[in-house]
A protein has these predicted regions:
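Membrane-embedded alpha-helical segments of transport systems
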Residues: 166, 193-194, 265-273
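Membrane-embedded alpha-helical bundles of polytopic integral membrane proteins
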Residues: 1-229
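Interfacial loop-to-transmembrane junctions
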Residues: 247-270
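Hydrophobic alpha-helical transmembrane segments of integral membrane proteins
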Residues: 129-130, 255, 272-273
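Juxtamembrane boundary at the C-terminal end of a transmembrane helix
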Residues: 280-288
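Short helical (or helix-break) motifs at transmembrane helix termini and adjacent helical loops
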Residues: 161-172, 235-247
C-alpha cells in the first residue's frame, strides 16, 4: 500500500500561502452569507475529495458521489432556500432531515449491492457527511445571525485562530509534556494551554474593537472570555480528531492545497469542530 511522502516546501512558499489563507479567512468573515456560500462549498468539496483519497490509501471504499451531492444540497438547506418553494422546497425540512434521508439511502444501497465491506463503506460515508459538509455548513448559520452575525462570525473565527496560533507559539517556546504522543507527538500540554489563554485574551479585545467601530458585539467581558475558551477547546479537539484520522491512514498531510501547509482538511480541521461548537453555544445563550 502506497503512502504519500511529505513534501518539503520552501519557507517562502509556506509564508506566502499562510498569508493568502489568513486574508481569505478575513474575507469570509466580512462578506455576507450568500457571498461566502461558494467559498464554503469549495472547501467542502475539496475536503471530501481529500477524505476519499485518504481512505483509498487504506484500500477502503466510500460513496464519494453521495458525499459531493450532500455537500451541494446542505448549503442551500442551511441558507433556508427551501422556503422559496418550487423544486427547492424539498430542502425545507433542514439539513438534519437531509442527513437522515442520505443515511437511509446509504443503507438501501448497501442492501441492494451487499458485499463484505458494505457496512464499513456506509460508516465511512456517514463519517464524511457529518465531519465535513455538515459541520462546515454551520459557518453559514453563524454569519447569517440577525444583527450580531458579523460579530459572532468574527468571535468564532478568532477564537479558533487564537487556539491554533497560541498553541503553536506556546508549544514551541515551553512545550515539554506531550498531550497526545500517539496521535501528534509535536502537540504539548503547554501548547494547548497557550491556545486557550490566547483565545481568552483575544475574544473580549476583538469584541471591544468591534463595538468601537459601530458594530454589534454578541458577548462582552467574562462572557466573551468563556466563549473564546470553549470554542478554542473544541478547535483543539478538531485538530486532534484529524491527527487521529491521518495517523490511522498513515499520511502526514491530507493534500497539497496550500504549499507548505498541507491540504484543505489540514487548514480547516480546527474550524470543523470550533464553528459548530460556537453556533451551539450561541443557540444556548439565546443569540441564535
Amino acid at each position: 500500500m502506497t503512502r504519500r511522502a511529505p513534501t518539503a516546501w520552501p519557507r517562502s512558499a509556506r509564508v506566502a500561502s499562510g498569508w493568502v489563507a489568513f486574508f481569505a479567512l478575513l474575507l469570509v468573515v466580512w462578506l455576507g452569507t450568500p457571498a461566502i456560500a461558494p467559498i464554503v462549498l469549495t472547501l467542502g468539496i475539496v475536503g471530501i475529495l481529500e477524505y476519499a483519497a485518504m481512505l483509498r490509501l487504506r484500500g477502503l471504499l466510500v460513496h464519494r458521489t453521495t458525499l459531493l451531492v450532500f455537500a451541494v444540497l446542505v448549503l442551500p438547506s442551511a441558507l433556508g432556500w427551501g422556503d422559496a418553494g418550487g423544486p427547492l422546497r424539498l430542502l425545507a425540512p433542514g439539513r438534519e432531515a437531509l442527513l437522515v434521508a442520505f443515511a437511509l439511502a446509504l443503507f438501501v444501497l448497501a442492501l441492494r449491492r451487499p458485499h463484505q465491506e458494505s457496512l464499513t463503506t456506509v460508516a465511512h460515508t456517514l463519517l464524511g457527511l457529518v465531519w465535513i459538509p455538515l459541520f462546515l455548513s454551520y459557518a453559514l448559520d453563524v454569519r447569517a445571525l440577525d444583527v450580531v452575525g458579523h460579530g459572532a462570525a468574527l468571535l468564532v473565527v478568532l477564537s479558533v485562530v487564537a487556539a491554533d496560533v497560541g498553541g503553536y507559539v506556546a508549544g514551541r517556546a515551553w512545550g515539554r509534556r506531550p498531550m497526545a504522543p500517539r496521535l501528534s507527538p509535536d502537540k504539548s500540554v503547554e501548547g494547548a494551554i497557550g491556545g486557550l489563554v490566547l483565545a481568552a485574551a483575544t475574544a473580549p479585545v476583538a469584541m471591544t474593537i468591534l463595538e468601537a467601530r459601530g458594530a454589534v458585539a454578541p458577548l462582552h467581558g467574562a462572557g466573551a472570555v468563556a466563549f473564546g475558551v470553549a470554542v478554542a477547546a473544541a478547535a483543539q479537539l478538531g485538530d486532534l480528531a484529524e491527527s487521529l484520522f491521518k495517523r490511522w491512514v498513515g499520511v502526514k498531510d491530507t493534500g497539497l492545497f496550500l504549499p507548505g501547509h498541507g491540504g484543505v482538511l489540514d487548514r480547516i480541521d480546527s474550524h470543523l469542530f470550533g464553528i459548530p461548537a460556537g453556533y451551539l453555544l450561541l443557540r444556548l445563550l439565546g443569540l441564535a
